Curated annotation (Swiss-Prot):
It comes from Clostridium acetobutylicum (strain ATCC 824 / DSM 792 / JCM 1419 / IAM 19013 / LMG 5710 / NBRC 13948 / NRRL B-527 / VKM B-1787 / 2291 / W). This is Putative polysaccharide biosynthesis protein with aminopeptidase-like domain. Contains an N-terminal region with low similarity to aminopeptidases, an insert domain, and a C-terminal permutated winged helix-turn-helix domain. Keywords: Carbohydrate metabolism, Metal-binding, Zinc. The lineage of its organism: Bacteria, Bacillati, Bacillota, Clostridia, Eubacteriales. Zn(2+) binds at residues 189, 195, 324. Binds 1 zinc ion per subunit. The genomic context suggests a role in the biosynthesis of modified polysaccharides; this association with genes involved in carbohydrate metabolism is observed in several phylogenetically distinct taxa. Is not expected to have peptidase activity despite low similarity to aminopeptidases.
Length: 434
């Protein structure tokens, strides 16, 4: 699958395109249901042919129930002078997601219990939700809150909460094998970028690249609201789970922070070894964390009755400075970070596609390489000239049990170095695929 290299080489340009998609999606007010999610899916469909699914409110999905659909047209708090002191149209984080409709006049003291701030970060608007308990509220900066004076305020939330449906999208690329790789991201957060428009845009462009390549494995891309969306998909697709070989959750991939990988619950699954091997040779700082049962949708895919090896490859992990606030905006995005995330995900996919197991066909002592002209057949180009050390590792460890990834770990070498050596040995019939 060497064709993927042209996309890796063009990652800097693609980082800018990913940013542009984030910028286009940023103004949309999304939640776990509603027209904002549908509008987001429509924009993604300009890039990849998403199949859209609608699941009716009230549908049982394991221990959960698909909630009512929420939509919002407008919301504001207006003082007696007619000034809007809080305006949803200025920032959609101003309204608690899933707020029920409100239209009343309130004093400041009556209104205060419904106003939410971050006293420690006075210039940030907090992101709040109330999905499963009917409630309403406004978020605003502490600075703005401190400016409010005793007055009568008109309070309006022009929203609807009624039977509808939950929307998710998926895109399936059929490979040579039915075994599939799951790449998933969530679509429910409103105007916040790292969490998680970065994941949405990244996975869109990963899918776009793979759609143009011939792959060994099949690939499934899932765009769904966090928690309830993955639970809904799992409950409706249990028959597909047997084909899922491994997966990754893409979130928080767009800032300038170091790369972070959260392992699967198994800790040593193939996807764990692949991601960690890629990170070892990425040339920059990274961090690997053991699994913990909170965070994003890896916790649903890792639940005992599902038990899929799904990790999460991020940059600054959730909880970063500005997380779930208005500070997670376009200014927080970093095009180089987006490009590096794209490149890293593609390198992981390259390793998944090329991690094969060989058997040495000349196992009694070392074969004579020179008479086979093998030094002229190495496949890695100028970056990987004749590499007898990599070849010795491949020949010695290719017993039909050790994969190329195993050999890369045991040798301490980059996976590509081992892979290119194996390619050369295979071409002169010193190896056969197991």
């Amino acid at each position: 699958m060497e064709e993927i290299n042209k996309y890796i080489q063009n990652s800097s340009e693609t980082g800018g395109e990913i940013y542009n998609l984030i910028e286009e999606l940023f103004p949309i007010c999304r939640s776990i249901t509603g027209n904002g999610v549908r509008k987001t899916m429509d924009i993604i469909r300009k890039h990849i042919p998403l199949e859209i699914h609608e699941v009716k409110s009230g549908t049982k999905v394991f221990d959960w129930t698909v909630p009512k659909e929420w939509n919002i047209k407008d919301a504001y708090v207006r003082n007696s002078k007619g000034e809007k002191v809080i305006d949803f149209k200025e920032n959609n984080l101003h309204v608690m997601s899933y707020s029920v409709p409100v239209h009343k006049t309130m004093t400041l003291d009556e209104l205060k219990p419904y106003l939410h701030t971050i006293p420690g970060n006075k210039d940030r608007i907090p992101y709040l939700t109330s999905y499963y308990k009917e409630n309403w509220g406004f978020s605003l900066t502490q600075n703005k809150f401190d400016e409010l004076c005793d007055d009568d305020y008109e309070v309006v939330i022009d929203s609807s909460l009624e039977d509808g449906s939950l929307t998710y999208g998926e895109y399936y690329i059929r490979g040579e094998l039915e075994e599939e790789i799951l790449l998933t991201t969530y679509t429910c957060h409103p105007s916040m970028c790292n969490d998680n428009l970065s994941g949405v845009a990244l996975i869109t462009f990963i899918a776009k690249a793979l759609s143009k390549l011939k792959t060994k494995y099949s690939y499934r891309f899932l765009f769904a609201p966090e928690t309830i969306g993955s639970i809904t998909w799992l409950s409706r697709n249990e028959d597909k789970l047997k084909n899922i070989k491994m997966g990754l959750v893409a979130t928080c991939v767009g800032d300038a922070g170091i790369k972070n990988y959260k392992r699967t619950k198994f800790g040593d699954a193939e996807i764990d070894k692949i991601v960690e091997k890629v990170l070892m040779h990425c040339g920059s700082e990274y961090y690997v964390a053991d699994f913990f049962p909170w965070g994003s949708d890896e916790r649903q895919f890792s639940s005992p009755g599902i038990n899929l090896p799904v990790g999460s490859l991020m940059r600054s992990c959730y909880g970063f400075d500005g997380y779930h606030t208005s500070a997670d905006n376009l200014c927080y995005m970093n095009k180089d970070g987006l490009a590096d995330s794209y490149k890293t995900y593609l390198e992981v996919i390259y390793t998944i596609e090329n991690n094969r197991t060989y058997l040495n066909l000349n196992p009694k002592c070392e074969p004579q390489l020179g008479k086979r002209g093998i030094y002229r057949m190495i496949g890695g180009g100028s970056d990987y000239p004749f590499d007898e050390f990599a070849m010795f590792w491949v020949l010695n460890m290719s017993d039909g049990k050790n994969s190329l990834l195993d050999i890369a770990y045991k040798s301490g070498m980059e996976f590509r170095r081992i892979k290119y050596a194996a390619d050369a040995l295979y071409r002169v019939e010193l190896l056969k695929l197991v």
